[in-house]
Amino acid sequence: METLLGLLILWLQLQWVSSKQEVTQIPAALSVPEGENLVLNCSFTDSAIYNLQWFRQDPGKGLTSLLLIQSSQREQTSGRLNASLDKSSGRSTLYIAASQPGDSATYLCAAMNSGYSTLTFGKGTMLLVSPDIQNPDPAVY
C-alpha cells in the first residue's frame, strides 16, 4: 500500500512539473520610428490556459493592463492595439498601429493556466519609438 501511495505522489509531482507554464517574449528590445506598425510576440508552453493578458510598464511605474484574451477568444482590440491568441500553436501577438513616442515602454504578456490563480509572465519587450524629427513642430520664442 505504501508503494502504491508513493507512486501516486510521484506521478502527481511529475504531472505538476510537466505542466508548468513557461512564457517567452522575443525580441527583448525593439526600436522603431514613429508611425510604424509593429508586432510583439509571446509564446507559451502549456496550451491549457484560462486567459492571456498584455501589460505595459513605464519606467519606475507599475503594470498597466492593456488587453485580456479569454481562452475561448481569438482576439481583442482596444484603440490602436490588437492582440491575437492561438492556443494550438502556443502564441499570442500584440499589434500596435501607427506607433507614437508615448508607446515607448516595456510590454509584457502573462498566461493564467486553467485551475491556477497565478499569472506566468514573460520577461518583456522593451519598446522605443523614436519621434519623427523630419517635420518638427515650430518653436516660438
Labelled PLM ranges:
Residues M1-P27, L108-Y116, F121, Q134:
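N-terminal Sec-dependent signal peptide, specifically the hydrophobic helical h-region
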Residues T24-A29, A139-Y141:
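Surface-exposed, proline-enriched loop/turn segments that connect beta strands in immunoglobulin-like
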Residues A28-S31, G79-G102:
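Extracellular beta-strand/loop-rich beta-sandwich domains predominantly from IgSF
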Residues P33-G35:
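Solvent-exposed, conformationally flexible loop/turn segments
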Residues N37-D46, N51-D58, Y95-A98, D103-N113:
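Structural signature of extracellular immunoglobulin-like
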Residues S47-S78:
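N-terminal V-set
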Residues M126-S130:
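Short beta-strand edge segments in extracellular beta-sheet folds
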Residues P131-Y141:
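Extracellular/luminal ectodomains of metazoan preproproteins built from arrays
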